[in-house]
Amino acid sequence: MKINGNLNIDSPVDNKNVAIVRSRNQMFFKAFQVAPNIWIAPERYYGESLKINEDQKSDGGIYDSNFLSTNNEKDEFLQATIKLLQRINNNVVGAKLLSLISTAIPFPYENNTEDYRQTNYLSSKNNEHYYTANLVIFGPGSNIIKNNVIYYKKEYAENGMGTMLEIWFQPFLTHKYDEFYVDPALELIKCLIKSLYYLYGIKPNDNLNIPYRLRNEFNSLEYSELDMIDFLISGGIDYKLLNTNPYWFIDKYFIDTSKNFEKYKNDYEIKIKNNNYIANSIKLYLEQKFKINVKDIWELNLSYFSKEFQIMMPERYNNALNHYYRKEFYVIDYFKNYNINGFKNGQIKTKLPLSKYNKEIINKPELIVNLINQNNTVLMKSNFYGDGLKGNVDNFYSNYIIPYNLNYEHSINYSYLDNVNIEEIEKIPPINDEDIYPYRKNADTFIPVYNITKAKEINTTTPLPVNYLQAQMIDSNDINLSSDFLKVISSKGSLVYSFLNNTMDYLEFIKYDKPIDTDKKYYKWLKAIFRNYSLDITETQEISNQFGDTKIIPWIGRALNILNTNNSFVEEFKNLGPIFLINKKENITIPKIKIDEIPSSMLNFSFKDLSENLFNIYCKNNFYLKKIYYNFLDQWWTQYYSQYFDLICMASKSVLAQEKLIKKLIQKQLRYLMENSNISSTNLILINLTTTNTLRDISNQSQIAINNIDKFFNNAAMCVFENNIYPKFTSFMEQCIKNINKSTKEFILKCTNINETEKSHLIMQNSFSNLDFDFLDIQNMKNLFNLYTELLIKEQTSPYELSLYAFQEQDNNVIGDTSGKNTLVEYPKDIGLVYGINNNAIHLTGANQNIKFTNDYFENGLTNNFSIYFWLRNLNQNTIKSKLIGSKEDNCGWEIYFENNGLVFNIIDSNGNEKNIYLSNISNKSWHYIVISINRLKDQLLIFIDNILVANEDIKEILNIYSSDIISLLSDNNNVYIEGLSVLNKTINSNEILTDYFSDLNNSYIRNFDEEILQYNRTYELFNYVFPEIAINKIEQNNNIYLSNNNENSLNFKPLKFKLLNTNPNKQYVQKWDEVIFSVLDGTEKYLDISIDNNRIQLVDNKNNAKTFIINNDIFISNCLTLTYNNVNVYLSIKNQDYNWVICDLNHDIPKKSYLWILKNI
């Protein structure tokens, strides 16, 4: 799909890609066609007034009638939206999505027999020109942060015919989901997926909603409901656990929609395909449209796209986050912060400025909770906000009868849109002006809908979690902490609540100490604050009770007033169990069932016919039992888990609130120090930098706490399912089984055409002897949660801050870093390499050989843990001091050096406090595995050599070791080999060291698909990671034989057989960095070469003409390998000439996965 990026707001009207067009309400606007049938209108959406009444404004909305009013703003909107479309198009599945939208033209309206009119068009003034349009992307309506998708005609959107649509979109403002910025590309993808429901005419009825969550904030039972499209699009765990459809849907949406789609597909074949009055382009678009199965669209969801684009998104209750989560908006500068790969520095590390609009966010709570005393005096007001979903007080489950005969199951799976052929679509000529015969009644009148919120108000004398949470929040920078909740709410804002016992005790302990007026005093104070906060916020406790063993969080009771009675939270939880963490405990409705009787017409069947029909009924009953299970599961998810999720959200907010308080406390102390001390400016700069790093480390500790919260409440929810819901399910199921067995037996005994032996056989065969829960595996549910244990998802980077690699090229040696931290590596050209313990090792020999690694992550400080490890082989005797590795500045930091034939680790802080640890003699010319681990929380330094602990030192007196952002690897006249130098941002324990030590020894071998070591001269089939089920085969073209992957018709191609050959005929196993030749068994033996014409991998007959490839493994996917020639990767191309070619060239736009190869045993 080609995106036209050569447009701007001043582009002249050409009535092709730039036009002045008419809106539904007869207004005119300038529109730009950026891709076939996809238009952008850089205007506010015309259908809503930009000035609305206050009561019409939505909670959380922002309203500015002047937004997007100047030509500069409009051009920025146009460029930003084009860039987002280019980002989507830059990924294979994104390009397929856009191609699918481009081809999905609505079915022409049958005006008269053989008179078909187009409904997807825009028209110019006076209807002089018509332009085909499937969708138009506008700016937002009255609420400038609301994205929306609006169909043209509701009837066509639902009956299979399809209709064009309009998207309202805000590209400039985004928000954080706590740790990460929401990527606007994923927000646009959501709108684009939704547009397919309208273009294909498969929109569900407006009343088809799913019970989504029980609103824990109201006293009465009230549900939030999710409409069907949002459910299907949302993805995440919601999608997996709410996939009970159609177990409890009476509505036949999936069945009827499929029929409607097939009807129009059939009409295309009969009425359109050979109709000479319809333009060929229209027919070609419809042909491509109907190559897609409607099920493919149902299976498109945000989880799939977020995975393919490597975009982070919330995984649970994505559609109901607003009820606890108030957004703050940030401004995206698409020139500075964003490119076609997303945020330039990632979703976490990018720094965006806060929007000026944050002060104008509409504040309309759904519920106001007044905490009152015995005199009815209001002590505090707390707000509950709506989740933006429809509310319903009816209990769906109490009225629902599980259907017996509705057996269609829409299973969840990811659609890879394999039937979308981008190359074919790009060849379709545009639909010209003269090809369009417009149907004038193609649109309904747009009527704005405003979500008017009226707050309810309740009084309570018992503080609720929301009251406790509010008491932990303050806007002022001048804070005073108190652990007395009642004292805080009586203080009228001068105090703020904290449940951090150790931290509060420490602050009380030092309250009367002398002022902190030196850097040393400050460092000690800062270190103590960090230590106590860490101990408080990450505290967990193992308990055992009647519900099993579990790890609980003791401070939850104090933080949110849950089980916060005279006993401790731990004791209350032990006695009452996890069900008492939530308010609404008795919600399970025993499902209504209706099982059909066995037809009396079968009474005189023969044994054979009776056996066959009874077996079908048995299977149907078994499937019905599965429906009953999913009904129970859905009730648990909707009514119970939603309450635990609320607690996860509130407890996580509490952690973040405490973190904010501690950071304000630190900043307050830092201001005092800067204003009231005689510390030099140089040292003040160092203190500032160190404090910044400590604030980062505090955030890391908070993340650990949030992960603990997630695990604790998820385990509690699972425990409630097992102990409170599952027994009701089994009891009910046993009764169902008993009734089914009874009716089956009674029927068989009445049968007239079989003997007693046959009756006994049929009774035994068709009775449920035991309750067999093949469809129920609680462990699978637990595993599902374990995949998403972080509510505030951290950017998925490894803990490595440096991971050294080295390899040989033709003319020089290359040294680099695989940590992904953008490390600058500087080294002399004459650096030597040798094969080491597991890989290439650096050989340091000459004087002053110096390798420098530079990145911001190397800056140590007062509180950060880190570890260093490497393989070392020393060939010298070192009697005098000889440096090896270090990170020091102004004699502050750490270093490793040789002295007295041993190795010394030195660490020194900015105040001159120093620790030197001499290690044993390592000058025996053998390889040694060195690990150094610094734990600042425990004030502990551990050193291991070859898996043996050789040093365990207290470093309590070591304060700030802030050093430069450079780590140097020095020769200093040494003669040493260094391999695998790595620096991590965490400690390493002995078990990890043991594992790494032995895995390194074993890890030098390349693995096949089954994790077996690859062998030379053994036969394999070759696959690409993108298409792991389709083997590489050959394509003959222009007298050449190329390697390809034909993923459309692979049955017609025979997989090739490959052997790996080594120049050393005695070598048996394939190792990293081996130089290999590929032999191909294709009648006669052939070999792999690279075509000089097109860089494709081709087969040649002469081994002397074969290319020698460097083979390596992927560091993240152990059973995948990479192949390079002259440091250029071999990859699988996007489809070209109906084939995915195997190519070796420098194409930076190919996704990384295309470089990964798999060898499978034959």
Curated annotation (Swiss-Prot):
One GO MF term: metalloendopeptidase activity
Function of the protein: Assembles with botulinum neurotoxin type E (BoNT/E) and protects it against pH-mediated inactivation or protease activity at pH 2.6 (the pH of the animal gastrointestinal tract) but not at pH 6.0. The non-toxic component is necessary to maintain toxicity.
Official protein name in the record: Non-toxic nonhemagglutinin type E
Subunit note: Forms a highly interlocked heterodimer with botulinum neurotoxin type E at pH 6.0 but not at pH 7.5.
Family designation: Belongs to the botulism non-toxic nonhemagglutinin family.
Superkingdom field: Bacteria
Biological-process GO terms, alphabetical: proteolysis
Gene3D superfamilies associated with the record: 2.60.120.200, 2.80.10.50, Clostridium botulinum neurotoxin b, 'coiled-coil' domain, Metalloproteases ('zincins'), catalytic domain like
Gene Ontology CC entries for this record: extracellular region
Pfam families associated with the record: NTNH_C (PF08470), Peptidase_M27 (PF01742), Toxin_BN_H (PF22133), Toxin_R_bind_N (PF07953)
Keywords, alphabetical: Virulence
Organism: Clostridium butyricum
Keyword Transport: no
